[in-house]
């Protein structure tokens, strides 16, 4: 039943195989593209005796997940396309957070003054208040965000498969426009590269290492970096205009309360480093659009299959 949604499923039919299966399960879950695994243990296994020495044979505490670097030629090619682009965009997904590559993303964006859009799962990859963050794309993306992504000459996808919700069902010219844009893509999972948009350069590798490689090559091509104060000013105006457009409904005292009012009141009292979980529906999409997240890893949405009931269970752990 669960095999289609896990990386691998095991059934423990021999109690002596239990330690080895658990060891393999944890290794697989954390390797490559992190994901769930299933270890099915029948009830009668827990009442059987086993030799404790079998646990000593596992690799307890020795799990080191290797991070694959980009092919050097791919890193150079991506750097060259970004350095030559007139209107590039970095499109960040949840892979940035899984790779803990937020600092590297910010460093590349700031060096070339490239705007950063994000997916739902990518919220928090760069502070929503960062002067180069242009916000979420897709069904809940803002018009200003899409005005930059649809007119980009180069988009570098980072840890995202350009999924349906983040790409407005792939309708041309709504969120992205393949006729105008050259797509580049980096992902830890090679099966995701070019899955939904054709790519000129696709590279498999860890984003934390890969972004560092690209920045190193970019610095060779543009020793002074780039500054685009006009772009930063446009982004700041767009953010201010959006906040202003929500000001009235966010302060409305009607009953029942508006979702915007709830978000405003919660934002005023919640600590900046509080960890937030959303569920399916407006609370997920509204928070992603209107609730500024400034610290990576402090917001978790049920993206992908959008499992209803994710929020309460995630909070409980």
Predicted segments with their positions:
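N-terminal alpha/beta PP-like core and its mobile active-site loop of ThDP/TPP-dependent enzymes
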Residues: 1-227, 237, 265, 269-272
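Small-residue hotspot
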Residues: 25, 315-317
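Active-site diphosphate/adenylate-binding microenvironment
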Residues: 237-315
């Amino acid at each position: 039943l669960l095999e289609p949604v896990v990386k691998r499923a095991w059934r423990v039919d021999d109690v002596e195989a239990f330690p080895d299966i658990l060891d393999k399960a944890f290794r697989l879950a954390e390797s490559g593209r992190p994901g769930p695994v299933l270890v099915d243990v029948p009830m009668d296994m827990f009442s059987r005796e086993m030799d404790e020495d079998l646990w000593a044979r596992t690799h307890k505490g020795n799990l080191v997940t290797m991070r694959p670097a980009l092919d050097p030629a791919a890193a150079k090619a991506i750097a060259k396309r970004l350095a030559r682009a007139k209107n590039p965009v970095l499109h960040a997904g949840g892979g940035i957070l899984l790779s803990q590559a937020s600092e590297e993303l910010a460093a590349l964006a700031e060096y070339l003054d490239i705007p950063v859009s994000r997916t739902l799962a990518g919220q928090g990859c760069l502070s929503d208040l960062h002067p180069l963050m242009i916000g979420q794309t897709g069904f809940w993306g803002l018009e200003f965000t899409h005005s930059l992504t649809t007119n980009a000459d180069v988009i570098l996808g980072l840890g995202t498969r350009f999924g349906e919700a983040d790409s407005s069902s792939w309708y041309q010219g709504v969120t992205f426009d393949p006729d105008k844009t050259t797509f580049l893509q980096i992902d830890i999972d090679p099966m995701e590269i070019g899955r939904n948009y054709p790519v000129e350069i696709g590279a498999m590798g860890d984003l934390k290492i890969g972004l560092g490689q690209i920045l190193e090559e970019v610095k060779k091509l543009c020793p002074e970096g780039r500054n685009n104060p006009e772009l930063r000013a446009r982004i700041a105006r767009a953010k201010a205009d959006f906040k202003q457009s929500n000001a009235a409904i966010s302060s409305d005292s009607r009953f029942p309360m508006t979702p915007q009012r709830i978000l405003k009141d919660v934002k005023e009292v919640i600590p900046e480093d509080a960890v937030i979980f959303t569920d399916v529906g407006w609370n997920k999409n509204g928070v992603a659009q209107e609730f500024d997240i400034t610290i990576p890893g402090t917001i978790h949405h049920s993206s992908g299959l959008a499992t209803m009931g994710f929020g309460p269970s995630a909070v409980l752990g």
